[in-house]
Swiss-Prot record:
Catalytic reaction list: RNA(n) + a ribonucleoside 5'-triphosphate = RNA(n+1) + diphosphate
Name of this protein: DNA-directed RNA polymerase subunit beta
Gene: rpoB
One annotated GO biological process: DNA-templated transcription
Pfam families, sorted: RNA_pol_Rpb2_1, RNA_pol_Rpb2_2, RNA_pol_Rpb2_3, RNA_pol_Rpb2_45, RNA_pol_Rpb2_6, RNA_pol_Rpb2_7
Keywords carried by this UniProt record: DNA-directed RNA polymerase, Nucleotidyltransferase, Transcription, Transferase
Family statement: Belongs to the RNA polymerase beta chain family.
Subunit relationships: The RNAP catalytic core consists of 2 alpha, 1 beta, 1 beta' and 1 omega subunit. When a sigma factor is associated with the core the holoenzyme is formed, which can initiate transcription.
Position of the signal peptide: none
Record keyword Transferase present: yes
Record bears the keyword DNA-binding: no
Top-level class of the enzyme under EC nomenclature: transferase
Summary of the function given for this chain in its UniProt record: DNA-dependent RNA polymerase catalyzes the transcription of DNA into RNA using the four ribonucleoside triphosphates as substrates.
Enzyme Commission identifier(s): 2.7.7.6
Length: 1188
């Protein structure tokens, strides 16, 4: 037997063909959401408050301090929040201290700070009753970036940018004349020496001393001349900068100083964030810049006087490692003192080294480091600016390297916690202005924190973020896999990110740093390709938001691959050589061969095994969860694999799903972590179990009660139904499955079914990827799914009185009311068809011009004679089903309703949808098609043992698409069916072709895995042997029931008077320009005329035509279409006197559109009137006959 047995949970064993020992289990797959939110509650929120507070008033006599905060119990439980359309949120109370500095009085008070949405255990938020997900955002990291650019003459120039988390950008660039310029916040450029002088280093010699002698520096100094001898060089530089930042305002050195200080050196206005400081220190550190340079002066330890490195030494990695501690502690530190008129007068510490120029051995180049400022410094310092300029000047000398902005070392993830913190910060800074004003205006003696704090800006910012941010998305809940994928999604779009139109090819492309961090396969097709990605299966965020991936450390000394796991970010990995997970190891755990395949930066090549630093932990660490669910992924073309991964997320949960015979072993973990199953929280023993709840007695005696969800409506209208797996007496451990969720079977993801599939053509019905299906799949409900739709009706107060929910509906027969209860609401369990009444409702009618008699009656009898019109909630077109549930909300019961609403009724209708012609089916390899014919079982081809085939696919769908994985799955699936086993073939480490053929032989199949098929209609065998096997097929969410649509009479657009378009508006089919040409070409003049008039926008014509049809009279001639009138009006507005004449040269009167219509859509009222008129005339004629 090939392969070995592996247990997945307590309910499933699979035969696995994996060969690679996995030393690390998959992490919890939704930790990117849950960990980030927990970190926000533990640290992020506190940091935001500490950033903005304390707040002082303008005279600095009062100060408001932050003490702490407490999050209390949520108002609603999860279930209540869902039912009441409320948010699952907890009140937050913040304690503030108000200090009066004049009197020394301190007032401490707790202030209610609004309700804060709380994340559920599943990593989602419930906002206004709907489940939402905050998608993590992929943004450019703050830090310093260097780039090169080639001008039109082929000359290479350089640029550099300091990008903060928030605040002004500082840019450097060279021009074609070899002069270096700087720009502050995207303004006009000035020579970079001007900024250096403004920082307090004003003399030319001083600048040359700091940066060393080079052409760039000399050229720039020559350009930057002293224009006004009255000013010092620093003051002149300050004024020049002020002129750039505030053109047209009177410039003084003092105002420039305060402006620059506010722009760069004020923590309230400028923030690098922890990650920005980390990136700047890393980039400007002398350690990386000295690597492989030849030192020009000996390096001496300042304390001991010991010579650490002799002049002329090449600074290799080992030399730098030997003096790393001294470098970190400020080796070669020089302190420069700025002059008194500088922006900041504090001394500036730099680390300064001299190295031999790589391009000219006789020249010396100066390298300046920023002397590693502390992590707490979140602003850019003068040392950073000078070190950045030094790096920039070094680039021209060939020292240092430019950055690749698509490298994942330069892009980071803003997960939910950080996005929320930014929103709270935004709200607090709006609140801050408000607080300052109130502190200054009101009487100091009686002020309390409660009085000066207005929480509205903060709650508004949070509400807006959850309700309408691009990153707050309605959860994709087609099935558990789509939920999981949505929680792990990384979007480059959104506020502060890219936009679709501006994103080029480079940003969207796969980068070598994506390996193990972002999936190269799973991304949408279409305009968002490459901008929306998915986290790889082992990906994990570090504290700075960079994605890490795990590797096994290689002990070079011992020549062994250890089981020690090291998590590396993309820029850390660049320094090492990493071997692939499938490198062969010997018994000792070392590499079996002297040469192994490995990666170093962007190169995949062979390396001597003694040079390798790390090894991949698993072959599936490259891909995301959905991609890792595709068996034989290694045999599929990547474009088709992309479709396969995306289509699994569109699978509809079936009534009786089955896990795949051929899986990848990922099905268990994906189902477990998706949040759709019920998982045991503690060890214990089951004491009670039914379909609705399970009780587990813990070892300490306490009782856990797990509620099982039955047929709840998911976000996408499918049935969210959980099924209990345990029975009384079972012992469960923490993490065990208590109940399967939708699309699960025995604790494994089960998106579809395992039908018997044959690759063969049949009467041409599977042309162009169409799918031919056996009627068995319809009769046995194999691909039947349940869909729940929610309809609601509310009663409001109108000007003419309140609307009413009632059984007494005007002009409706008793038959239509048979399923309504005494209130007028449909009973649960009733079968309804389109047009049936769900909730009977009447609205008072506007009483237009009552006659004197009516007014008298009205005065005598009150409301009895008042007119009402029927505004009942009816089943819309194309919908039918069984009423599953009715929920009634009223003010009287204490339900929170919108203002003006007295009662709200929600009706849930369940629909059982069998598979039918027009539904879309797919495999896991991007092989999708539409059901074209459902054939009776007796006519389907059958196997020699009499088993009929379930599905026939076209063999031509395979070769050109290059997704051969489906054929491998087909054969292995048949073997698994015959052997009665389930199989796991993990991606990139699955069944080889030998394993496949061994298993086929073991199952007693023919050596070519094909079989003779017999035609079900004649009993004759087909000419050739056919590939028949079991393939996992799923039914997708694109169902024909949602798309089928027909209209006879419906709404018309207000302006053009033409029918609306689209199924949602109950619109017509557009008969466009080209269709009109077709009718013209055939000379079908009468058809053409009615298409352009009655059926479109001839308002009077269509009324008369309707009347003629109802009375059985000949249809009158059409009039002038409304669009023609619009054209005439347009020409008249251009001053052309245009009139319409008939064949006798008489002018045709064009009616104006009715004034006073304020509705965008004219409904079928005109036709209703025509119907009423016809009915009245018929009644009158009948009465007249009676009299005669």
């Amino acid at each position: 037997m090939a392969g070995h047995e592996v247990r997945y949970g307590k309910h499933r064993t699979r035969r696995s063909f994996s060969r690679i020992k996995e030393v690390l289990d998959l992490p919890n797959l939704i930790e990117i959401q849950t960990d980030s939110f927990q970190d926000f509650l533990d640290h992020g929120l506190k940091e935001v408050f500490e950033d903005v507070l304390p707040i002082s008033n303008f005279t600095n006599t009062m100060e408001l301090e932050f003490v702490g905060y407490e999050i209390r119990e949520p108002k609603y439980t999860l279930e209540e929040a869902r039912i009441h359309d409320a948010s699952y949120s907890a009140p937050i109370f913040v304690t503030f201290r108000l200090i009066n500095k004049e009197t020394g009085e301190i007032k401490t008070q707790e202030v209610f700070f609004g309700d804060f949405p709380i994340m559920t255990e599943m990593g989602t938020f419930i906002i206004n009753g709907g489940e939402r997900i905050i998608v993590s955002q992929l943004v450019r990291s703050p830090g310093v970036y260097f780039n090169d650019k080639v001008d039109k003459n082929g000359k290479v120039g350089y640029g550099s940018t300091v990008i903060p988390n928030r605040g002004a950008w500082l840019e450097l660039e060279t021009d074609s004349k070899d002069i270096a310029y700087t720009r502050i916040d995207r303004t006009r450029k000035i020579p970079f020496t001007t900024l250096v002088r403004a920082l307090g280093f004003s003399g030319d010699d001083e600048i040359l001393d700091i940066f060393g002698d080079s052409d760039l520096v000399r050229n720039t100094i020559e350009k930057d001349i002293h224009k006004n001898p009255m000013d010092s060089r620093t003051d002149e530089a300050l004024k020049e900068i002020y002129e750039r930042l505030r053109p047209g305002e009177p410039k003084t050195a003092e105002s420039s100083r305060s402006l620059l200080e506010a722009r760069f050196f004020d923590p309230h206005r400028y923030d690098l964030a922890a990650v920005g400081r980390y990136k700047i220190n890393k980039k400007l550190s002398v350690k990386t810049r000295l690597l492989n340079q030849t030192i020009a002066e000996p390096l001496v330890d300042a304390e001991t006087g010991e010579i650490l490195v002799e002049a002329g030494t090449v600074m290799t990695r080992s030399v730098i490692d030997s003096i790393a501690e001294q470098l970190d502690n400020g080796l070669n530190k020089i302190t420069y003192i700025p002059n008194d008129s500088a922006v900041l007068t504090a001394p500036v510490d730099l680390q300064k080294f001299k190295v031999v120029a790589p391009t000219d051995p006789d020249r010396v180049v100066t390298i300046i480091g920023n002397a590693n400022p502390s992590d707490k410094v979140r602003i850019v310092t003068p040392a950073d600016i000078l070190a950045e300029m030094s790096y920039f000047l070094n680039l021209a000398e060939g020292i240092g390297r430019v950055d690749d902005i698509d490298h994942l070392g330069n892009r980071r993830i803003r997960a939910v916690g950080e996005l929320l913190a930014n929103q709270v910060r935004l709200g607090l800074s709006r609140m801050e202005r408000n607080v300052r004003e109130r502190m200054s205006v009101q009487d100091n003696e009686v002020l309390t924190p409660q009085q000066i704090i207005n929480i509205r800006p903060v709650t508004a910012a949070i509400k807006e973020f959850f309700g309408s941010s691009q990153l707050s998305q309605f959860m994709d809940q087609h099935n558990p896999l789509s939920e999981l994928s949505h929680k792990r999604r990384l979007s480059a779009l959104g506020p502060g990110g890219l936009t679709r139109d501006r994103a080029g090819y480079e940003v969207r492309d796969v980068h070598y740093t994506h390996y193990g961090r972002m999936c190269p396969i799973e991304t949408p097709e279409g305009p968002n390709i490459g901008l929306i990605n998915n986290l790889s299966s082992y990906g994990h965020l570090n504290k700075y938001g960079f994605i890490q991936t795990p590797y096994r450390k290689v002990d070079r000394e011992a020549g062994v691959v250890t089981n020690e796991i090291v998590w590396l970010t993309a820029d850390e990995e660049d320094e090492f050589i990493v071997a692939q997970a499938n490198s062969k190891l010997n018994e000792k755990g070392g590499f079996a061969e002297p040469i192994v395949m490995g990666r170093h930066q962007g190169n995949n090549q062979e390396f001597p095994s003694d040079q390798v630093d790390y090894m991949d932990v698993s072959p599936k660490q490259v891909v995301a969860v959905a991609t890792a669910c595709i068996p034989f992924l290694e045999n599929d073309d990547s474009n088709r694999a992309l479709m396969g991964a995306n289509m699994q997320r569109q699978a509809v949960p079936l009534i009786d799903p089955k896990a795949p015979y051929v899986g990848t072993g990922m099905e268990y973990q994906a189902a477990h972590d998706s949040g759709a199953a019920v998982i045991a929280q503690h060890d214990g023993k089951v004491t009670y179990a039914d379909a609705d709840k399970v009780e587990v007695r813990r070892e300490d005696g306490s009782l856990d009660v797990y509620q099982i969800q039955k047929f709840r409506r998911s976000n996408s209208g499918t049935a969210y139904n959980q099924r209990t797996l345990v029975k009384v007496g079972d012992v469960v451990e923490k993490g065990d499955f208590i109940a399967d969720g939708p699309s699960m079977e025995n604790g494994e993801m089960a998106l579809g079914q395992n039908p018997i599939v044959a690759y063969m053509t049949w009467e041409g019905y599977n042309f162009e990827d169409a799918v031919i299906m056996s009627e068995r799949l319809v009769k046995d409900d194999v691909y039947t799914s349940v869909h729940l739709e929610e309809y609601e009706s509310e009663t409001r107060d109108t000007k003419l009185g309140p609307e009413e929910i009632t059984r007494e509906i005007p002009n409706v027969g008793e038959d239509a009311l048979r399923n309504l209860d005494e209130m007028g609401i449909i009973r649960i369990g009733a079968e309804v068809k389109e047009g049936d009444i769900l909730v009977g409702k009447v609205t008072p009618k506007g009483e237009k011009d009552l006659s004197a008699e009516e007014r008298l009656l009205h005065a005598i009898f009150g409301d009895k004679s008042r007119e009402v019109r029927d505004t009942s909630l009816r089943v819309p077109h194309g919908a039918d089903g069984v009423v599953r549930d009715v929920k009634i909300f009223t003010r009287a019961n204490g339900d929170e309703l919108q203002s003006g609403v007295n009662m709200l009724v929600r009706v849930y209708i369940a629909q059982k949808r069998k598979i039918k012609v027009g539904d879309k089916m797919a495999g896991r390899h991007g092989n999708k098609g539409v059901v074209s014919r459902i054939v009776p079982v007796e006519d389907m081809p059958y196997l020699p043992d009499g088993t009929p085939v379930d599905i026939m696919l076209n063999p031509l769908g395979v070769p050109s698409r290059m997704n051969i994985g489906q054929v491998m799955e087909l054969h292995l699936g048949m073997a698994a069916r015959n052997l009665g086993i389930h199989i796991a073939t993990p991606v990139f480490d699955g069944a080889s072709s030998e394993d496949l053929w061994d298993t086929v032989r073991e199952a007693g199949m023919d050596s070519d895995a094909k079989t003779i098929l017999y035609d079900g209609r004649t009993g004759e065998p087909f000419d050739n042997r056919v590939s028949v096997g079991v393939m996992y097929m799923i039914k997708l969410h694109h169902m024909v029931d949602d798309k089928l649509h027909a209209r006879s009479v419906g709404p018309y657009s207000m302006v053009t008077q033409q029918p609306l378009g689209g199924k949602a508006q109950f619109g017509g089919q557009r008969f466009g320009e080209m269709e009109v040409w077709a009718l013209e070409a055939y000379g079908a003049s009468n058809v053409l005329q009615e298409i352009l008039t009655y059926k479109s926008d001839d308002v009077n014509g269509r009324l008369k035509a309707y009347e003629a049809i109802t009375k059985g009279k000949p249809i009158p001639k059409p009039g002038v279409p409304e669009s023609f009138r619009v054209l005439v009006k347009e020409l008249q507005s251009l001053g052309l006197d245009m009139r319409v004449l008939d064949e006798d040269d008489n002018e045709v009167e064009l009616r104006d559109l009715d004034e006073g219509e304020d509705d965008d859509v004219i409904h079928v009222d005109d036709l209703e009137k025509a119907r009423e008129k016809a009915a009245q005339e018929a009644k009158a004629a009948f009465e007249a006959e009676g009299k005669e």
